[in-house]
Regions:
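Sec-dependent signal peptide recognition
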Residues: 1-7
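Catalytic cores of phosphodiester-bond hydrolases, prominently lipid phosphodiesterases
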Residues: 15-186
Length: 186
């Protein structure tokens, strides 16, 4: 009889890399910097005229973007991503959120911040999150408390921090941008 020996190569376990770096895991989200894109959906790849970016949201996420700025409108009886004029480019919000879900499924140690410039209601927006099976990932930050670390958000499966410039705070997980951060006019 012949005996076959199978040797398995063992390597030391890789440290967690929260948003691409093990150094970020213990950092609170408000102590972290993320790369973001403005009008993230407006890309050549997605057919927007004029585009802000060459690549669409899936490639942006693969390239390290963790902050998405999205403009939403109601068009064709659904929540759409548009850059002002929907006739010059649009994408169903649920499709973009499905891309985000696919990315989070592939990269479970990522946290993404989404900021909406919304011309639709909080309920319409959150319905798209529910349809894309992402609503449970939305983090709701209690006021007057410290922000959690990235690893805490990851372990709690709350890997989406969602803000809105209007109508935020009306639905859990869809937070008011101006309650939580400051912006300048430039």
């Amino acid at each position: 009889r012949r005996m076959i020996w199978i040797l398995l190569a063992c390597s030391p376990s890789q440290p967690f890399q929260c948003n691409g770096s093990e150094l970020l895991c213990d950092k609170a989200i408000d102590q972290s910097t993320v790369l973001g894109t403005h009008n993230s959906m407006a890309s050549t790849e997605a057919g927007f005229l004029p585009p802000n970016h060459v690549y669409g949201i899936p490639q942006q996420l693969r390239d390290g973007v963790r902050g998405l700025n999205l403009d939403t409108y109601w068009s064709e009886d659904q929540a759409m991503l548009c850059h002002g004029i929907c006739e010059l480019g649009q994408q169903p919000l649920v499709d973009a959120l499905s891309d985000v879900k696919a990315f989070l499924d592939e990269q479970p140690y990522s946290v993404i911040i989404i900021t909406f410039q919304a011309a639709i209601s909080a309920e319409q927006t959150v319905a798209a999150f529910e349809q894309a099976e992402l609503a449970s990932e939305m983090y709701e930050h209690p006021l007057s408390t410290a922000w959690p670390s990235l690893i805490t958000l990851i372990e709690n499966q709350q890997r989406l921090i969602v803000f809105a410039s209007n109508d935020g705070g009306m639905v859990p997980g869809y937070m008011d941008q101006w309650t939580h951060w400051i912006d300048n006019p430039y």
